[in-house]
Amino acid sequence: YDRVLTMGQDTLLVLGRPDEPLLQMLLEAASDLRVVVGDRMEEMAPAAPDATLILSWSATRELLRDVLAVTPHLRWLHIMSAGINHLLSPELAATPALLTNGRGAFSSSLGEWVMGAILYFAKDFRRLIRVQGEGRWEPCDVTEVKGQTVGIVGYGDIGREVGTRAHAFGMHVLGLTRRGPATPPPGDPAEAIFGPAERLDMIARCDYVVVTAPLTPETRGLMGAAEFAAMRPDAVLINIGRGPVVDEQALIAALSQG
């Protein structure tokens, strides 16, 4: 498609290449804007000085940094993802434009993904796929998730979506927040909400530990040696947050030690 797609008074730079169905939806929603789409600086450069809006669809840190340096009239920058750590730069920190992100937009989808991961381990899908590929059948033992316990580290929007689906499967749901302990509000899927001081106690109760916490200075390495030591030997760790929330070396050591 052409780089300049629609014409209007305000200019929207879309940093990335949306798939065609999503692109058409975007163009319909932005029909009164001049829309420029691309993933290279040379595509953005002609329109950047007049741009008032930026949609970071799948921009790299370098592309966003370079575009911000030449958009003096920018009023609004929206980043599609919930996390923005991968895009941080001095230019981003200094922009006076309104900055928004996709927080909450992916909660339902991630909740479904976590349940898929839980069932993957409970029903041993990896082995089933392997023997299917080998063209043979063999009996297998699987577990039910009903009655098992899932602990959610970072019990926010995404965590509650996970909890809602886990509760629907008959699982016991425990949440961990930095402001806990707290009494779950009426209708909440969690049976208990723990605070940082109780995190090891919560983790020790769990068949599945799901990490949904954002990456901050306080959460970097949140899941470390003490947390892995508290987990049951047969417990499963599922991390859908940022990688550095889990201390990778401590995880490797815990797995090596069985």
Task: Describe every region a protein language model picked out.
Residues 15, 151-154:
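Conserved N-terminal Rossmann-fold NAD(P)-binding element of oxidoreductases
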Residues 36, 174, 244:
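Conserved beta-strand positions in the Rossmann-like core of class I SAM-dependent methyltransferases
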Residues 9, 146-149, 225, 234:
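Phosphate-coordination loops involved in phosphoryl transfer and adenosine-cofactor binding
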Residues 45-49, 68-71, 145, 201-206, ...:
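A short, aliphatic-rich alpha-helical micro-motif
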Residues 94-149, 157, 161-164, 168, ...:
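Phosphate-binding beta-alpha-beta segment of Rossmann-like dinucleotide-binding domains, i.e.
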Residues 1-98, 224:
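An N-terminal-biased, well-structured beta-alpha scaffold segment characteristic
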Residues 57, 80, 98-104, 197, ...:
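Short beta->alpha connector loops at strand-helix junctions that form conserved
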Residues 180-258:
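Rossmann-like adenosine-cofactor binding region
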